[in-house]
Amino acid sequence: MSLILNILREMLEYFGVPVEQVLLIWENKDYGSTRSIVRIIGKMLPLEPCRRPNFELIPLLNSVDSDNCGSMVPSFADILYVANDEEASYLRFRNSIWKNEEEKVEIFHPLRLVRDPLSPAVRQKETVKNDLPVNEAAIRKIAALENELTFLRSQIAAIVEMQELKNSTNSSSFGLSDERISLGQLSSSRAAHLSVDPDQLPGSVLSPPPPPPLPPQFSSLQPPCFPPVQPGSNNICDSDNPATEMSKQNPAANKTNYSHHSKSQRNKDIPNMLDVLKDMNKVKLRAIERSPGGRPIHKRKRQNSHWDPVSLISHALKQKFAFQEDDSFEKENRSWESSPFSSPETSRFGHHISQSEGQRTKEEMVNTKAVDQGISNTSLLNSRI
């Protein structure tokens, strides 16, 4: 025991604690800074004190703010909930709505301590307040999208209605055509009994002037000319009077015909959404070959060299068959300078051979030169191999 006391005294002397103060520890009460040696040593050492936690009450939670109150990690703010909870602790979380919350907040409101401006709860509330304008902007965007959706629905309904009107106008147009045929027959029967003097016709009904004569090279293509219609003939009278009678007798029919024509023209200008959206589900994508890594495989085109015998022979044969199949009238005036195998052009005068035969002989010479050159190239390649 004496050894332990000596060790304690040496330790106290080392830290600078007087022995008289140690003796007073046993006589004092069990609270304060003198109740243990550890507290006394900690008081003597130049240590920075730790920040003390500040307990505060969380305000009333409702259904709107419950999702924005932070994480599920427990903290010192959950102590009052645990102490005052009447139900099982495993059935409740911090973000849930508690029973009798208003009564609890009114009871613990006067006991609320001073808030630390750097506490996590205050920072959490500030972030929630900062998020409010973002939520309002999102609500405005959703409202704008809903308005646009209603506008699109109204447009689709209008398009469907116009399609139905178009079908109805088509059916009515068939009925009007039948009525016109019957009226035309009646007017033709009436016109057979009418006769009009040539002096009573207006001056606007005159024969058109004759067309100018065509040049002699196109005279064979000119259609046969018909004699001009006399202004006093009965045919014009018969054709004009029924039209005037029909316009006088049926003005309402003409107006309805014009209105139906304008409506059908408008319906043709507007595209039909039903036809556009009809084949949306039938779209099929083309299968693309991919490598094991997932990249699409692109087929490389074969680059034919200029001295490849196969390409030379195929080019010569193409020229030959193209020359045989081409029967245009410009074939005689075509020059041979574009061909890479052509010989220098000589004068075409003084030859007894016709022009077509000369062209054929030149083409055969070009083809034979190309074939000979291709065979020589293949022999060179085989000798090198």
UniProtKB/Swiss-Prot annotation:
GO terms for cellular component: mitochondrion. The modification N-acetylserine is found at residue 2. Pfam families: Mito_fiss_reg. The modification Phosphoserine is found at residues 119, 291, 328. Keywords: Acetylation, Mitochondrion, Phosphoprotein. Its main location: mitochondrion. Residues 195-268, 331-363 are annotated as: Disordered. Transmembrane segments: none annotated. It is found in: Mitochondrion. Residues 207-216 have a biased composition (Pro residues). Residues 231-257, 336-346 have a biased composition (Polar residues). GO terms for biological process: aerobic respiration; mitochondrial fission; mitochondrion organization. Belongs to the MTFR1 family. May play a role in mitochondrial aerobic respiration essentially in the testis. Can also promote mitochondrial fission. This is Mitochondrial fission regulator 2. It comes from Homo sapiens. The gene is MTFR2.
